[in-house]
Amino acid sequence: MALDESITSRDYLYGRLLAVAEYIERTALDAAGEKRPTNAERLMQRFADHPCDTWRQIELQLSPYEQRLQGSSRAGLLFRARKTLDAIMNQFQGDDFKAPGKLSGEFLLGYHCQLTSLYSKSGDDTPKENP
């Protein structure tokens, strides 16, 4: 299944957010030659159980990686990724973003579809492997 930007379910949107965060951090780590799991990867289980609180943590942790990209030849990539994050956030309906409750498996669909889309648009459809 390809990315469907018209899907506005809470779980799908949260998965998409996680994918964009993963993409930003992975791009910055790869550019620096660092081989380690991203915060999005490390916090995926917690994210599935407590998405709103965990998203806050993940987004705040993106700042140093965004700064790395901003001062590099990949600043355009960062601009597009931030624009995508903003567009996804704008799709949440009412109180869905802060609604309590775990995410269903649908968040994984949103995550993988968004990640595939990001890597195919960047021309690098083979993300680096983690250790």
PLM regions and their residue ranges:
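Intrinsic-disorder/low-complexity detector
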Residues: 1-131
